[in-house]
UniProtKB/Swiss-Prot annotation:
The lineage of its organism: Eukaryota, Metazoa, Chordata, Craniata, Vertebrata. The keyword Nucleus applies. Signal peptide: none annotated. InterPro entries: Distal-less_Homeobox_TF, HD, HD_metazoa, Homeobox_CS, Homeodomain-like_sf, HTH_motif. This is Homeobox protein DLX-6. Residues 119-130 have a biased composition (Low complexity). Residues 49-108 bind DNA. GO terms for molecular function: DNA-binding transcription factor activity, RNA polymerase II-specific; sequence-specific double-stranded DNA binding.
Amino acid sequence: MSHSQHSPYLQSYHNSSAAAQTRGDDTDQQKTTVIENGEIRFNGKGKKIRKPRTIYSSLQLQALNHRFQQTQYLALPERAELAASLGLTQTQVKIWFQNKRSKFKKLLKQGSNPHESDPLPGSAALSPRSPALPPVWDVSASAKGVSMPPNSYMPGYSHWYSSPHQDTMQRPQMM
């Protein structure tokens, strides 16, 4: 059997009656992987196979925590922008905010200050192996109403949004 017949992630989630044999070295009984309504199950019952847990970098966590301190809920455009700037999917950002709100409410019920439980950016939030990284953006400048020149926001990505007549302009050099 080829590898694609073993991996449930390579099969179509839209085919609700799809079934594939798992490894042939199971001697006691043949197990089948069944996909029903988008849920992957062994022998048609039991626990779902879950995607692996997302591991966030210290920079991503710092930016997510900083944004959560500003607002606990993101509008769709804000979520899309934050996800793109951090190299995450919108779903990952959405789930992170849901989990953070849940943790925040749980800490409030326990009577502790939820802001104290979060490590301060740039201190314990970074592991010993993580280099000190600059913030993704300077929120303090934008919060004070300081106007920024056009195309200065995230210069590394500004060329994605340029119109066709701007293609002749000099793009920032990546280091």
